[in-house]
């Protein structure tokens, strides 16, 4: 993707130097990032074709300001800012906010609103006048579809059912079940665009304006491939590890630290063994399909006194 961006810029401004800033949390593997950027892995790097691109990194939360004010021409974030600064509460009946109800669902919506405004407000401060922000996030479309639930199996309900069964079977405690919460909020389109369309909102007053918004469903490539090769074992071996890589940390965090490490890991192994059996029994309908909200915003002007939402 970035190679296409740089190629387009080079056609118009062949002699310009470009600065590319990566941002992630301090505990992220920046060493692996720059090994990839500098072509020290098996993947081709854009630097091999565009040596005038200068790369930098920032180890800060994107819920705060990362770059100097009015210094950014183009900002891009994908599949990231649905994560919250913290879970606002435990969910009594589910592991994810899509299954939360009543006050608990409202708490996640409110935390999602606050963190979204912090994210957009920080980017608004960084953008130059007429600078552009492109954000792609898991969301909820007009039909109620969301990541993990776009017409096949409901991925979050399956993991929740297994986790709840573990309580009934004495594998985990009720406290551990309630302590397992993904710090995420899937926003509707209305929730996504409110800060950049409401004249009373501080983000809107900072000059950030909505240019375009749409939702798209992106089908799981592993599930698509399975419809052709029909090899269940191959599908399981490709599909389950891709989920485990990012689901496991949150599930593990819910298990009491008073348990020995090997016991905690054994519970996680059992969770994914049962999930794997579910996939083997009924592979059709499984797949990690995305339902994403695509937003493009522009900073229309630079106010004399921009509000700092991350203060």
Language-model-derived ranges and their functions:
Residues 129-263:
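Substrate-binding/catalytic lobe of Class I Rossmann-like enzymes that use SAM or dcSAM, i.e.
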Residues 199, 288-311:
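Core SAM-dependent methyltransferase catalytic element
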Residues 77-110:
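A mobile, often basic/glycine-rich helix-loop segment
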Residues 17-25:
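Conserved SAM-binding motif I beta-strand of class I
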Residues 74, 100-106, 130-138:
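Conserved beta-strand signature within the Rossmann-like core of class I S-adenosyl-L-methionine
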Residues 89, 127-129:
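Helix-to-beta-strand junctions that scaffold the AdoMet/dcAdoMet cofactor pocket
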Residues 1-14:
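Conserved SAM-binding loop of SAM-dependent methyltransferases across substrates and taxa
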Residues 31-65:
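S-adenosyl-L-methionine
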């Amino acid at each position: 993707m970035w190679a296409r961006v740089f190629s387009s810029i080079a056609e118009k401004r062949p002699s310009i130097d470009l600065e590319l800033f990566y941002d992630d949390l301090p505990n992220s593997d920046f060493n692996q990032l720059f090994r990839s950027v500098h072509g020290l892995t098996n993947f081709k790097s854009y630097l091999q074709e565009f040596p005038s691109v200068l790369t930098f990194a920032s180890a800060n939360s994107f819920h705060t300001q990362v770059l100097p004010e009015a210094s950014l021409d183009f900002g891009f974030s994908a599949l990231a800012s649905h994560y919250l600064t913290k879970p606002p509460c435990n969910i009594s009946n589910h592991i994810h906010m899509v299954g939360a109800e009543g006050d608990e669902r409202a708490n996640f919506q409110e935390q999602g609103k606050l963190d979204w405004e912090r994210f957009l407000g920080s980017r608004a401060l960084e953008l130059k006048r007429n600078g552009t922000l492109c954000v792609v996030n898991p969301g909820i479309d007009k039909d109620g579809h969301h990541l993990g639930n776009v017409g096949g199996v409901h991925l979050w309900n399956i993991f929740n059912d297994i986790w709840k069964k573990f309580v009934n079977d004495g594998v985990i405690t009720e406290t551990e079940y309630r302590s397992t919460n993904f710090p995420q909020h899937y926003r509707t389109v209305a929730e996504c665009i409110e800060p950049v369309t409401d004249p009373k909102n501080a983000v809107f007053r900072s000059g950030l304006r909505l240019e375009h918004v749409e939702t798209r469903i992106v089908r799981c490539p592993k599930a698509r491939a399975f419809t052709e090769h029909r090899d269940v074992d191959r599908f399981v071996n490709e599909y389950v590890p891709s989920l485990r890589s990012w689901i496991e940390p949150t599930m593990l965090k819910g298990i009491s630290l008073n348990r020995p490490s090997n016991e905690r890991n054994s519970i996680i192994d059992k969770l994914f063994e049962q999930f794997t059996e579910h996939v083997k029994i009924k592979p059709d309908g499984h797949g990690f399909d995305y339902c994403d909200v695509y937003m493009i915003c522009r900073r229309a002007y630079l106010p004399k006194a921009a509000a700092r939402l991350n203060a």
